[in-house]
Every structure is written in structure tokens, then in C-alpha cells.
């Protein structure tokens, strides 16, 4: 087991270095002068322009800027935002909490709906329900997030007036932003908020969670169905049926438990999909998370924010994938003993 862990950790280091290099190169390839963007319509004198370039370290050769960036990362310094002059880490934390809360709710929705639908589709293979589930899963997987979000807003929020259009809570909800309990709005409003605040936070969460969870839901349905069909054809399932076990016991205890191994892996790998989808979802619903933060930073060429934000997001994806690999090695010894 130790060798398995060391092999996985050995892959993390070069991946991390590659991410820093690609992120740095990508950010500096974006056209536009960050100093001129900061100045806006006011303009700036050549002397002041050169002074700001020197203060931001942008007057140095690329390799020196990269080494300075790596040195800061190794010491936990991701830089300071060019716009707000606030350390990137301090800007990252509250936005990460907002995105994490949205991502967890989206994954709960996708898992709670996807696994039962996938199991039922496999059990009723060839039925109308099976064909409908597969068709909807394919549609959900290929559906543009932006279009799907706008359609739900028009139908549910505007036409039916059932949920709010944007934000995490309504303007009338008061919470002490300077001293949040957890940073997660659902928890804070449940513990600290006044009557109705929690319901308001839940109402704001519904549509973004559905939109963000649609693609993972489609993937989970397809993987659960495929894995269940494979397991239901195994000899030990036929043996369990021959022993007179009830159909429900065979499906839940014997089939589903073994079919969940690839499903768990897929769920873990959906973290990247959630973070990518969060960029569009947060833009549509004005959700103050990582997606909107990075998009705003890209538009104003805020190099430290983009580099630090992408690096932190990539690190989270790497750690989650590493955790999934380790858990899969625990539940499936053949994987960890494989050379």
C-alpha cells in the first residue's frame, strides 16, 4: 500500500510543476497591458506606466518573473491582486466557500437522482423508462450550460416566479459578512439568520445547483446503468437468485454494492467538471464564487489573481483525484498491487 501511495504522489509533483508553467505562460500570452487596463479611460503618463511596471515586476524577463512566482508559491505567497491590492489567498477563501457550497449541493443532487435512475434503468432494461433515462442522460450531457441556465431562469424564475433569479441571498437578508460563522450561506442562515433566511438561501441555491449538477447527473446515470448491467450478468448474481433471495436484496446487497466501484470513481472525477461548469453557472446566476472571480480577473489582466486562482483550483482537482485513486486502491486491492 505504501508503494502505491508513493507512486501516486510521485505523479503529483511533475503535474503541479507543469500546471504552474502552463498557467504562467497562458496568462502572459493574453493580449493587453494590465497597467493600461488598470488606468482605464483616465490614461497614464509614460513615466508612471514604467513605474507601475517596475512595481508589479512586469518589466523583468519572463524567466525571472516565473522564478519569482515559483519562489512565492513555495513560500505560500500567491501574490497581491493588481486591482484590490489584497493578497490573492484572502480573496480566494470566501469565493472558494461559495463555489464549494454550490458544488456540494450540485453533486448531492446529481448523486441522489443519478444512482437510483441508473439502477432502475438497468433493472428495467429495454423498457420505456430505460430508453427515456438514456435519452435524457445524453441530452443533459450535451446540453450547453449557458442555454440550460437561461431556460430555467425564464421558466421557473420569470414565468412561474418560484425561485430568485440571482445571488446567494436576497438583499433584505442581513448577515455579518465581516465575521461569518462558516462562510457557507446555508449553514450560516440556518444557525445565525432570522426566520425565513434559510428558506431564502435554499431558494437561491435550487436553480444553480440543478444547472451545475446536470452534466454530472447524466454521467452518473450512464455509468450506474452500464455498471449495473455488467454486474447483473455475473455468475454470483445468478447464484443469489437461485438461492431464493428476493429481487430487492439481490439488486441492493449483491449487485449495487459491486457496481458502485466505477461509479464512485466517476463521481470523484466530476470535480473538474463542476469547477469548469461553475464558471458559466456563476456568471449566469451572479454567484460570487471562483468562476466569476477568475473571469473578472481575466478581463482586467490581473495576473496574480489568475495565476493563483487557477493554481489553487488545479491543486484541488489533483488532490481529489489522488484521494479517489487511494480510495479505489483500498476497496480494490488489484489496483494497488498492479505494477
From Swiss-Prot:
The gene is dppB. Gene3D superfamilies: MetI-like (1.10.3720.10). Its main location: membrane. One of its GO terms (cellular component) is plasma membrane. GO terms for biological process: dipeptide transport; heme transmembrane transport; protein transport. Residues 31-102, 157-171, 222-259, 331-339 are cytoplasmic. GO terms for molecular function: dipeptide transmembrane transporter activity. Residues 96-328 form the ABC transmembrane type-1 domain. Keywords: Cell inner membrane, Cell membrane, Membrane, Peptide transport, Protein transport, Transmembrane, Transmembrane helix, Transport. Residues 1-9, 124-135, 193-200, 281-309 are periplasmic. The complex is composed of two ATP-binding proteins (DppD and DppF), two transmembrane proteins (DppB and DppC) and a solute-binding protein (DppA). MppA can replace DppA as binding protein for heme and ALA transport. Part of the ABC transporter DppABCDF involved in dipeptide transport. Responsible for the translocation of the substrate across the membrane. This is Dipeptide transport system permease protein DppB. It is a multi-pass membrane protein. It comes from Escherichia coli (strain K12). It is found in: Cell inner membrane. Pfam families: BPD_transp_1, BPD_transp_1_N. The chain crosses the membrane at residues 10-30, 103-123, 136-156, 172-192, 201-221, 260-280, 310-330.
Amino acid at each position: 500500500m505504501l508503494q502505491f501511495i508513493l507512486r501516486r504522489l510521485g505523479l503529483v509533483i511533475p503535474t503541479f510543476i507543469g500546471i504552474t508553467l502552463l498557467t504562467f505562460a497562458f496568462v502572459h500570452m493574453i493580449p493587453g497591458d494590465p497597467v493600461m487596463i488598470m488606468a482605464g479611460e483616465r490614461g497614464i503618463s509614460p513615466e508612471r506606466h514604467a513605474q507601475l511596471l517596475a512595481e508589479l515586476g512586469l518589466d523583468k524577463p519572463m524567466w525571472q518573473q516565473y522564478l519569482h512566482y515559483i519562489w512565492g508559491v513555495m513560500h505560500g505567497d500567491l501574490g497581491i491582486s493588481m486591482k484590490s491590492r489584497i493578497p490573492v489567498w484572502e480573496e480566494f477563501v470566501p469565493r472558494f466557500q461559495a463555489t464549494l457550497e454550490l458544488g456540494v449541493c450540485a453533486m448531492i443532487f446529481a448523486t441522489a437522482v443519478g444512482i437510483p435512475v441508473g439502477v432502475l434503468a438497468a433493472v428495467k432494461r429495454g423498457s420505456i423508462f430505460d430508453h427515456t433515462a438514456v435519452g435524457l442522460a445524453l441530452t443533459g450531457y450535451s446540453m450547453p450550460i449557458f442555454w440550460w441556465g437561461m431556460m430555467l431562469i425564464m421558466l421557473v424564475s420569470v414565468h412561474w416566479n418560484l425561485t430568485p433569479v440571482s445571488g446567494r441571498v436576497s438583499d433584505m437578508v442581513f448577515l455579518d459578512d465581516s465575521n461569518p460563522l462558516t462562510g457557507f450561506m446555508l449553514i450560516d442562515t440556518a444557525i445565525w439568520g432570522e426566520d425565513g433566511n434559510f428558506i431564502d438561501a435554499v431558494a437561491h441555491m435550487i436553480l444553480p445547483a440543478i444547472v451545475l449538477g446536470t452534466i454530472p447527473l447524466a454521467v452518473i446515470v450512464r455509468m450506474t446503468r452500464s455498471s449495473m448491467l455488467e454486474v447483473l450478468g455475473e455468475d454470483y448474481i445468478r447464484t443469489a437468485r437461485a438461492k431464493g433471495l428476493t429481487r430487492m436484496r439481490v439488486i441492493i446487497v449483491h449487485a449495487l454494492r459491486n457496481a458502485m466501484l466505477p461509479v464512485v470513481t466517476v463521481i470523484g472525477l466530476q470535480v473538474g467538471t463542476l469547477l469548469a461548469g461553475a464558471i458559466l453557472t456563476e456568471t449566469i446566476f451572479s454567484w460570487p464564487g471562483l468562476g466569476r472571480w477568475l473571469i473578472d480577473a481575466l478581463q482586467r489582466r490581473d495576473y496574480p489573481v489568475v495565476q493563483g486562482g487557477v493554481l489553487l483550483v488545479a491543486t484541488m482537482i489533483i488532490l481529489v483525484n489522488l484521494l479517489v485513486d487511494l480510495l479505489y486502491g483500498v476497496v480494490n486491492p488489484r489496483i494497488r498491487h498492479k505494477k
